[in-house]
Curated annotation (Swiss-Prot):
Similarity field: Belongs to the short scorpion toxin superfamily. Potassium channel inhibitor family. Alpha-KTx 12 subfamily.
Biological role stated in the UniProt entry: Inhibits voltage-gated potassium channels.
Name listed for the protein in its UniProt record: Potassium channel toxin alpha-KTx 12.6
Summary of the tissues where the protein is detected: Expressed by the venom gland.
SUPFAM superfamilies noted in UniProt: Scorpion toxin-like
GO molecular function, one term: ion channel inhibitor activity
GO CC terms, sorted: extracellular region
InterPro entries in UniProt: Scorpion_toxin-like_sf, Scorpion_toxinS_K_inh
Disulfide topology: C30-C51, C36-C56, C40-C58
Keyword annotations: Disulfide bond, Ion channel impairing toxin, Neurotoxin, Potassium channel impairing toxin, Secreted, Signal, Toxin
Locations listed in the record: Secreted
Amino acid sequence: MKMKIFIITIVIALFITSIVEAQNKLDVKCVRLETCREPCKKQLCLLPMKCMNGKCVCSPSRKIC
């Protein structure tokens, strides 16, 4: 029984790690906040950035410090 719980814990930990790694691959940075003519590459976001009103913005507006 203890071995089964241990294996389930390992599987859950690996699953969470894979989700975090996938999220890190989605991170986009912004080069210029004032224009979206170039790809967004300066700010780190939890999700890819979008060009809104000529500016690169995080969507949702949560940044990774």
